[in-house]
Amino acid sequence: MVRTVAKRQFGVSTRLYQHQRLSREHLGEIAAHGFETVEVVADRQHVDFHNPAVVADLQQWLAEARLELHGVDVPIGTASEDSDQALFMARRLPMRMLVVHAGKPREAAREVERLAGLASPLGVAIAVDSSSDSMSPAGSLVHFVETLDAAAGICFDFAHAQRGGDLVDAIETVSEHLITTHVPVDSAIDWPSALTAVQKVGYEGPFVFDIAGRMAAKETLQRARRVRERFEKLLCMSI
């Protein structure tokens, strides 16, 4: 019997363009490099998600580029009202995740629980980013998620976990709660081992390249595409 494997999605965070207004051309550029999905950074200078006309434009641009909106990434320190409005884009734009960055655990727990209550009727999952300093090491984040009075998962940041120690161990630690990822383009990560661990724990969601715009976007996307191609080969080998 031949095992069929669903095609893995790869996406790009619009952090690549965060210091600009997000435009049709930006999304077209991401799609032109072969990516299927995007994560939008909820920065009002980047995307004014309070403005229904801007949300409507975003919906149209995504459709034109044939991109899915995987999720919205809410930066740390974002006001609750802005977090809510970023989430409410899901009333018009189908999306899977709202990625949040936790501060102090007690306050973060209240905010995540509040957002989870708003997100559930919209079919959106809350993912706590593992790069949050207060949630390191990985075991601390797992404890945080498991003690919430609401459902939430983990957005696993590979670069941050690598800096923190044993990456494979961290992947295994968060495995039961892993629902999305952030992936670097440049790193010293042992990808064969990391991706084997990802396959082992059963994660089938997208790999989202989360890259700051320190160089030309086109060059960065070309590099991300090469990393994607390497990932695809390694994932096939580890099946």
Predicted regions and their residues:
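Structural motif corresponding to the early beta-alpha repeats
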Residues: 28, 35-112, 121-125, 187, ...
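Histidine-centered active-site/metal-ligand motif
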Residues: 73, 101, 131, 160, ...
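Short, aromatic/basic amphipathic alpha-helical patches
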Residues: 58, 115, 224-226
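Short, well-ordered, mixed-charge alpha-helical segments that flank or form enzyme active sites
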Residues: 106-108, 134-137, 162
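Histidine-acidic metal/acid-base catalytic patches
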Residues: 2-11, 16-36, 84, 89-94, ...
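S-adenosylmethionine/decaboxylated-SAM
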Residues: 109, 118, 145-146
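Conserved anion-binding
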Residues: 121-142, 153
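Short catalytic-loop micro-motif centered on adjacent basic/acidic residues
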Residues: 12, 71, 126-130, 156-157
